[in-house]
């Protein structure tokens, strides 16, 4: 299980180098808010760790999603991550297919991560269980669960441990890897280890409990020690 940490600035990224994966995003623009391409480039330049880039919480806009994904890949991101804020498997298929093609045609070595939301019912968006088979069909590498509305409620408030374990095992059978995120705390780590996704994504946990505070290197090291 790898630890992905989401700094919100270049300065924070410099304090996140202990993480397994550095995730460039802009929390002020949403759960998977996109940061600037020059931030991705600079983080990639000084880090020897894989870099992930969130490209946004997308409504049904396949063209916009494809172009944004391509931009993140060109800027140097190793993982390109998009959230789907709409309902419907066929609409999801169109967006996922476009994003995978935009990235993989030129950068087959890069990873495409498709996110749905644990709180999809209140978001009015596609369920993670409905999204995952579509992502597998269209050639994505990872599927992810995160909270869409950031009100300090955890993914565990919407999907319990058994549900997340089933999700992770189902993804493995589909040939997908799993990333889990969504207001996790240090107290959640034992459950996450039992679920055993490939990646857990955190921000608030390593900011002292407030995702709008600053990433702390000491808390990243604490989290790493706990998940190993």
List PLM regions with ranges.
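Extreme N-terminal starter segment of soluble prokaryotic enzymes
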Residues: 1-3
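Catalytic cores of alpha/beta
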Residues: 8-18, 53-75, 122-134, 180, ...
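Glycine-rich, positively charged N-terminal anion/phosphate-binding segment
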Residues: 10, 30-46
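Glycine-rich phosphate-binding active-site loops on the catalytic face of alpha/beta enzymes
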Residues: 20-33, 74-89, 142-152, 195-219
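C-terminal helical cap(s) of enzyme catalytic domains, especially alpha/beta-barrels
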Residues: 39-43, 88-102, 202-228
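Aromatic/hydrophobic pocket-lining residues that form π-stacking "cages" and hydrophobic walls in ligand
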Residues: 40-43, 68, 99, 131, ...
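Conserved anion-binding
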Residues: 50-52, 56-67, 75-156, 170-174
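Hydrophobic secondary-structure block in the mid-to-C-terminal portion of proteins
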Residues: 150-211, 217
């Amino acid at each position: 299980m790898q630890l992905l940490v989401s700094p919100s600035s270049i300065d924070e990224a410099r304090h996140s180098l202990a993480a397994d994966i550095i995730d460039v995003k802009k929390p002020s623009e949403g759960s998977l808010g996109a940061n600037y391409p020059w931030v991705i480039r600079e983080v990639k330049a000084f880090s020897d760790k894989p870099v992930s880039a969130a490209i946004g919480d997308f409504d049904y806009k396949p063209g916009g999603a494809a172009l944004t994904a391509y931009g993140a890949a060109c800027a140097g991101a190793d993982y390109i991550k998009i959230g789907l804020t709409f309902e419907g498997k066929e609409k999801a298929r169109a967006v996922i297919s476009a994003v995978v093609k935009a990235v993989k045609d030129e950068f087959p070595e890069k990873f495409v991560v498709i996110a749905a939301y644990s709180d999809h019912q209140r978001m009015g968006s596609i369920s993670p269980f409905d999204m995952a088979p579509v992502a597998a069909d269209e050639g994505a590498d990872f599927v992810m669960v995160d909270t869409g509305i950031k009100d300090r409620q955890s993914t565990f408030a919407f999907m319990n441990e058994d549900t997340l374990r089933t999700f992770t095992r189902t993804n493995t059978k589909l040939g997908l890897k799993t990333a889990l995120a969504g207001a996790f705390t240090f107290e959640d780590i034992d459950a996450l280890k039992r679920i055993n996704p490939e990646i857990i994504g955190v921000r608030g946990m390593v900011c002292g409990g407030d995702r709008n505070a600053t990433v702390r290197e000491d808390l990243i090291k604490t989290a790493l020690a706990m998940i190993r």
